[in-house]
Amino acid sequence: MHLRYLLLLSLLALSACGFHLRGTQVASRTNVSELAIKSVSAPLIAEQVSSQLQLGGTRIVEPSDKTRRVLTLRNETFDRDVLSVSADTGKVKEYQLTLHVDMSVTDSKGKPVVDNETISVSRDYTFDESSILGKSNEETSLREDLVRQVSAQIVRRVNAVTK
Protein backbone atom coordinates (compact mmCIF):
# COMPACT_ATOMS: atom_id res chain seq x y z
CA MET A 1 0.00 0.00 0.00
CA HIS A 2 2.80 2.43 0.93
CA LEU A 3 4.65 1.46 -2.24
CA ARG A 4 1.63 2.45 -4.30
CA TYR A 5 1.48 5.91 -2.68
CA LEU A 6 5.22 6.34 -3.10
CA LEU A 7 4.96 5.45 -6.79
CA LEU A 8 2.04 7.84 -7.27
CA LEU A 9 3.90 10.63 -5.48
CA SER A 10 6.99 10.01 -7.65
CA LEU A 11 4.95 10.19 -10.85
CA LEU A 12 3.28 13.42 -9.73
CA ALA A 13 6.63 14.99 -8.89
CA LEU A 14 8.08 13.93 -12.24
CA SER A 15 5.18 15.34 -14.21
CA ALA A 16 5.13 18.55 -12.15
CA CYS A 17 8.73 19.36 -13.07
CA GLY A 18 7.84 19.43 -16.78
CA PHE A 19 9.66 16.24 -17.77
CA HIS A 20 8.54 14.55 -20.98
CA LEU A 21 10.10 12.05 -23.33
CA ARG A 22 11.81 13.46 -26.40
CA GLY A 23 9.49 13.55 -29.39
CA THR A 24 6.30 13.33 -27.31
CA GLN A 25 5.75 17.05 -26.90
CA VAL A 26 2.50 18.43 -28.17
CA ALA A 27 3.15 21.40 -30.41
CA SER A 28 1.99 24.72 -29.06
CA ARG A 29 -0.41 26.92 -31.00
CA THR A 30 1.19 28.80 -33.85
CA ASN A 31 0.55 32.43 -34.77
CA VAL A 32 0.13 31.62 -38.44
CA SER A 33 -3.29 30.53 -39.68
CA GLU A 34 -2.08 29.71 -43.20
CA LEU A 35 1.38 29.19 -44.70
CA ALA A 36 2.84 27.90 -47.94
CA ILE A 37 6.10 25.95 -47.80
CA LYS A 38 8.49 25.81 -50.76
CA SER A 39 11.34 23.36 -50.44
CA VAL A 40 14.39 23.73 -52.62
CA SER A 41 16.78 20.90 -51.69
CA ALA A 42 15.51 20.62 -48.09
CA PRO A 43 13.03 17.71 -48.08
CA LEU A 44 13.60 16.39 -44.53
CA ILE A 45 13.25 19.81 -42.93
CA ALA A 46 10.22 20.77 -45.04
CA GLU A 47 8.36 17.61 -44.03
CA GLN A 48 9.14 18.09 -40.33
CA VAL A 49 8.30 21.83 -40.33
CA SER A 50 5.02 21.14 -42.13
CA SER A 51 4.12 18.49 -39.58
CA GLN A 52 4.97 20.72 -36.59
CA LEU A 53 3.04 23.67 -38.02
CA GLN A 54 -0.02 21.53 -38.71
CA LEU A 55 0.07 20.19 -35.15
CA GLY A 56 0.11 23.82 -34.01
CA GLY A 57 -3.01 24.65 -36.02
CA THR A 58 -1.50 26.12 -39.19
CA ARG A 59 -3.08 25.18 -42.50
CA ILE A 60 -0.40 24.34 -45.10
CA VAL A 61 -1.36 25.50 -48.60
CA GLU A 62 0.23 25.52 -52.04
CA PRO A 63 2.16 28.70 -52.93
CA SER A 64 0.06 31.12 -55.00
CA ASP A 65 -0.49 34.85 -55.49
CA LYS A 66 -3.12 34.81 -52.73
CA THR A 67 -0.91 33.17 -50.10
CA ARG A 68 -0.23 35.57 -47.22
CA ARG A 69 3.12 34.05 -46.21
CA VAL A 70 5.54 31.72 -47.98
CA LEU A 71 8.31 29.87 -46.16
CA THR A 72 11.16 28.86 -48.47
CA LEU A 73 13.68 26.25 -47.28
CA ARG A 74 16.95 25.69 -49.15
CA ASN A 75 20.33 24.01 -48.94
CA GLU A 76 19.75 21.38 -46.28
CA THR A 77 23.27 20.07 -45.60
CA PHE A 78 24.80 17.75 -43.03
CA ASP A 79 28.49 18.20 -42.20
CA ARG A 80 30.58 15.74 -40.23
CA ASP A 81 33.80 17.22 -38.88
CA VAL A 82 36.56 15.61 -36.84
CA LEU A 83 36.64 16.99 -33.30
CA SER A 84 39.46 14.96 -31.77
CA VAL A 85 42.03 12.38 -32.76
CA SER A 86 43.78 9.85 -30.53
CA ALA A 87 47.37 10.88 -29.83
CA ASP A 88 48.42 7.21 -29.66
CA THR A 89 46.82 5.78 -32.78
CA GLY A 90 46.03 8.85 -34.86
CA LYS A 91 42.45 7.61 -35.31
CA VAL A 92 39.33 9.70 -34.91
CA LYS A 93 37.81 9.73 -31.41
CA GLU A 94 35.05 12.33 -31.80
CA TYR A 95 32.99 13.79 -34.61
CA GLN A 96 30.74 16.83 -34.76
CA LEU A 97 27.58 16.51 -36.84
CA THR A 98 26.06 19.81 -38.03
CA LEU A 99 22.86 20.48 -39.95
CA HIS A 100 22.48 23.75 -41.87
CA VAL A 101 19.40 24.99 -43.70
CA ASP A 102 18.62 28.37 -45.26
CA MET A 103 15.17 29.84 -44.74
CA SER A 104 13.29 32.89 -45.90
CA VAL A 105 9.75 34.11 -45.34
CA THR A 106 7.97 36.40 -47.78
CA ASP A 107 4.64 38.17 -47.52
CA SER A 108 1.81 38.17 -50.09
CA LYS A 109 3.60 40.81 -52.20
CA GLY A 110 6.83 38.82 -52.30
CA LYS A 111 8.53 41.21 -49.89
CA PRO A 112 10.99 39.38 -47.58
CA VAL A 113 10.02 39.25 -43.92
CA VAL A 114 13.00 37.00 -43.16
CA ASP A 115 15.64 37.15 -45.86
CA ASN A 116 17.90 34.14 -46.37
CA GLU A 117 18.67 33.29 -42.75
CA THR A 118 20.79 30.21 -42.01
CA ILE A 119 19.73 27.94 -39.15
CA SER A 120 22.40 25.56 -37.83
CA VAL A 121 22.47 22.96 -35.06
CA SER A 122 25.42 20.79 -34.01
CA ARG A 123 25.93 17.70 -31.89
CA ASP A 124 29.09 15.75 -31.17
CA TYR A 125 29.56 12.07 -30.55
CA THR A 126 32.39 9.69 -29.79
CA PHE A 127 33.54 7.22 -32.40
CA ASP A 128 34.79 3.71 -31.74
CA GLU A 129 35.97 1.51 -34.60
CA SER A 130 35.15 -1.64 -32.64
CA SER A 131 31.43 -0.81 -32.68
CA ILE A 132 30.92 0.69 -36.13
CA LEU A 133 27.34 -0.58 -36.52
CA GLY A 134 26.29 0.95 -33.19
CA LYS A 135 27.96 4.25 -34.02
CA SER A 136 26.31 4.27 -37.44
CA ASN A 137 22.93 3.87 -35.73
CA GLU A 138 23.88 6.63 -33.28
CA GLU A 139 24.74 8.97 -36.16
CA THR A 140 21.41 8.21 -37.86
CA SER A 141 19.59 8.95 -34.61
CA LEU A 142 21.54 12.20 -34.18
CA ARG A 143 20.64 13.25 -37.73
CA GLU A 144 16.93 12.71 -37.00
CA ASP A 145 17.28 14.68 -33.76
CA LEU A 146 19.02 17.54 -35.60
CA VAL A 147 16.18 17.67 -38.13
CA ARG A 148 13.66 17.96 -35.27
CA GLN A 149 15.71 20.68 -33.56
CA VAL A 150 16.19 22.77 -36.70
CA SER A 151 12.51 22.38 -37.58
CA ALA A 152 11.48 23.58 -34.12
CA GLN A 153 13.77 26.62 -34.51
CA ILE A 154 12.22 27.42 -37.88
CA VAL A 155 8.70 27.15 -36.44
CA ARG A 156 9.68 29.48 -33.58
CA ARG A 157 11.22 31.92 -36.07
CA VAL A 158 8.08 31.89 -38.25
CA ASN A 159 5.96 32.50 -35.13
CA ALA A 160 8.18 35.41 -34.10
CA VAL A 161 7.88 37.24 -37.42
CA THR A 162 4.11 36.77 -37.71
CA LYS A 163 3.07 38.20 -34.34
Ranges and model annotations:
Residues 53-57, 105-109, 153-162:
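Sec/Tat-exported extracytoplasmic proteins
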Residues 58-69:
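Short acidic low-complexity segments
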Residues 28-30, 66, 90-96:
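Short coil/turn motifs at beta-sheet boundaries
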Residues 1-15:
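Sec-dependent bacterial lipoprotein signal peptides
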Residues 130-163:
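C-terminal/domain-edge helix-coil "capping" segments
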Residues 39-47, 92-96, 136-149:
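Soluble non-cytosolic domains of exported or imported proteins
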Residues 72-118, 122-137:
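Surface-exposed short loop/turn segments
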